[in-house]
Design a protein with these regions (language model features):
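Short glycine-cluster motifs
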Residues: 1-34
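A contiguous loop/helix-start segment that scaffolds small-molecule binding in enzyme catalytic cores
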Residues: 25-27, 35-147
Length: 147
């Protein structure tokens, strides 16, 4: 735990998912998926219209509604990551698309507490992991051109 650093940014980062990346996503939104009245936040529909990375907290019970909104906007192929129990020994990660993530969540039995990340930045996870491994295996100092 780092005081002042939100799980909305820290947990994706621990899985090599940046919330912004030059040329991919210029901004991000953090949304509570489920309101106090146990309804889907109306901000999710607004976010589905955007090209920003969308980070949804407390949204697993509304996953079906969330994916339906993104599909209505023609975003069924947009990458999605679900990170359950991020930064703990029980962490689990599911990767898919808007169209496939419900199946992946069921297959891996992903439940709350979880963070849902929707956006093209999810596709950069593997590349960033490779770069990280390169830095860990070599004593490289300086700027990496792929970052």
């Amino acid at each position: 735990v780092v005081p002042g650093i939100s799980s909305a940014v820290a947990v994706p980062t621990l899985q090599n998912i940046p919330v912004t990346k030059r040329g991919v996503a210029e901004s991000f939104r953090v949304i509570t998926g489920t309101t106090k009245a146990h309804k889907l936040s109306t901000d999710v529909a607004l976010a589905a219209k955007s090209n920003a990375t969308v980070v949804i907290l407390m949204g697993m019970s509304k996953l079906s509604e969330i994916t339906a909104l993104f599909c209505q906007e023609g975003k069924q192929n947009v990458p999605v990551a679900i990170i359950q129990s991020g930064s703990t020994a029980n962490e689990k990660v599911g990767i898919g698309t808007v169209a496939s993530i419900e199946h992946e969540a069921k297959k891996q039995q992903l439940t709350n507490p979880a963070i849902i990340i929707i956006g093209e930045v999810v596709n950069h996870r593997q590349k960033l992991k490779e770069i990280q491994n390169e830095f860990q295996t070599k004593e490289v100092i300086g700027f990496h051109p792929d970052l």
